[in-house]
């Protein structure tokens, strides 16, 4: 993923998740949405891209449940909590509630409606799988640069990984990244 947000745009991690209702809140059941396939993730991202029309957002495919959304916004001052920290927790307490996040919450609510009605979730239900019923937006922060690997060690280098985080670190240090077809970063690869 080689995304360079423009002026006035911010990138956010956009993870597909499975929420479960409780008596007074929605609970983060699975922050990976059952490790859905990259193909299914792309299908759902396309639905979000075509149906969320009242907000200036662009969705970018990553790996499985972990994707990226770029939106027009000033940087957020408050940290958005990663979904893996919320498993088993009610999400209401982690939803940003300041006026600064109004559009972000609106996007998440729209996504829930779109995903609820998507044919992919009907198929998942027939197969006995949990639905992909929400997105979780997080990972806001500032872009950074690292000291150049080449300047530091008088060598060039490449990183072979499926991890988007490690690819980002490598690029920030001026290193090449190598993608391996079929690699997901999960234990099966």
Predicted regions mapped to residue ranges:
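…; additionally, a secondary subgroup of soluble metalloenzymes is captured
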Residues: 1-189
């Amino acid at each position: 993923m080689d995304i360079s947000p423009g002026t006035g745009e911010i990138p956010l991690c956009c993870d597909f998740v499975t929420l479960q209702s409780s008596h007074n809140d929605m609970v983060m059941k699975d922050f990976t949405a059952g490790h859905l396939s990259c193909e299914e993730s792309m299908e759902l991202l396309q639905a979000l891209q075509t149906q969320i029309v009242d907000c200036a957002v662009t969705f970018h495919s990553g790996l499985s449940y972990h994707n990226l959304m770029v939106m027009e916004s000033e940087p957020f001052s408050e940290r958005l909590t990663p979904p893996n920290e919320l498993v088993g927790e009610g999400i209401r307490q982690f939803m940003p509630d300041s006026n600064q996040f109004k559009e972000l919450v609106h996007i998440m609510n729209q996504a829930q409606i779109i995903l609820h009605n998507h044919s992919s979730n009907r198929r998942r239900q027939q197969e006995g799988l949990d639905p992909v019923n929400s997105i979780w937006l997080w990972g806001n922060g500032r872009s950074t640069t690292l000291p150049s690997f080449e300047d530091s060690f008088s060598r060039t280098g490449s990183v072979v990984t499926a991890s988007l985080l490690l690819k980002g670190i490598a690029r920030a240090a001026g290193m090449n990244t190598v993608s391996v077809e079929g690699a997901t970063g999960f234990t099966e690869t």
